[in-house]
Regions:
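C-terminal transmembrane helical hairpin of 12-TM major facilitator-type secondary transporters
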Residues: 114-120, 124-127, 131-185
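Helix-loop-helix hairpin linking two adjacent transmembrane segments in secondary transporters
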Residues: 2-48
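Glycine-rich segments within core transmembrane alpha-helices of 12-TM secondary carriers
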Residues: 1-10, 200-213
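Paired intracellular helix-loop junctions of major facilitator superfamily
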Residues: 1, 185-196
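Extracytoplasmic gate region of multi-pass secondary transporters
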Residues: 10, 69-129, 179, 213
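Flexible cytoplasmic inter-helical loops of multi-pass small-molecule transporters
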Residues: 44-63
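Juxtamembrane helix-start elements in MFS-like secondary transporters
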Residues: 104-113, 160, 164, 195, ...
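Intracellular helix-loop hinge segments at the cytoplasmic ends of transmembrane helices
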Residues: 14, 97, 183-189
């Protein structure tokens, strides 16, 4: 659902900016946000019974965090998700200005972002499946490497609509496909009792990387 929203959002935003200017566009987005907030009030999770081992039941919140940060693999996941946030926010924030600097039409950046949102659907689902067949840490290494490679190839390629489309498709397949293997690794190492907390810390570092990507880009 989020990917569909990311696919439609650039197209609708660009159209609204052309037709109604930014003030009216901002009002439309505020309406959608209020609607989403109103709907979220009714999304209460159902109570579920979680079967866990005795060790999981005895473990406290603080001991789970201490265990995680004493694990080398968890530290690498945190650092990897920092890079993840840096990469996707660098592209998502600065691709419009970059395309304009390269002399491309304003719609080229819109097409790239829309393609990223659309193909993220297939990338995320595909990576979730591959995570059941291959080692998740190897998949993550390949993903981050392909992301960096795709950005470098795009930057050093001559500006054209074809290259923009290829980049949008490629980066879309790699966009949030890091989430399934990362979440899976956390669950495999530490169990599911504090999965939300431990993955939340990983995602917090992702947001620090996102800040760096937006600010330094």
């Amino acid at each position: 659902a989020a990917s569909i929203g990311y696919f439609l959002s650039p197209l609708l935003t660009k159209y609204s900016l052309v037709e109604f200017e930014w003030e009216q566009t901002l009002k439309y987005f505020m309406i959608f946000i209020v609607i989403g907030l109103a709907v979220s009030i009714f999304l209460f999770p159902a109570k579920t019974v979680i079967n866990s081992s005795q060790a999981d039941r005895d473990q406290t919140f603080l001991s789970a965090i201490k265990e995680a940060f004493s694990h080398r693999g968890y530290i690498l996941l945190v650092l990897g998700f920092f890079v993840c946030g840096f990469q996707i926010t660098l592209v998502g924030t600065h691709i419009p200005g970059y395309m304009q600097d390269r002399g491309m039409a304003g719609w080229s950046a819109t097409i790239i972002l829309a393609l990223i949102g659309f193909f993220n659907i297939f990338g995320t689902l595909g990576m979730g499946y591959l995570g059941t067949k291959y080692k998740k840490k190897n998949l993550l290494s390949i993903l981050y490497s392909l992301r960096a490679l795709s950005i470098c190839v795009f930057i050093f390629s001559p500006p054209s609509m074809l290259n923009s489309i290829i980049f949008g498709i490629t980066f879309g397949l790699l966009w949030l496909s890091t989430v399934p293997p990362t979440n899976g690794i956390v669950a495999q190492i530490f169990g599911t009792k504090y999965l939300s907390t431990l993955f939340g810390i990983v995602f917090l570092c992702h947001q620090f990387g996102a800040f760096a990507g937006a600010f330094l880009g």
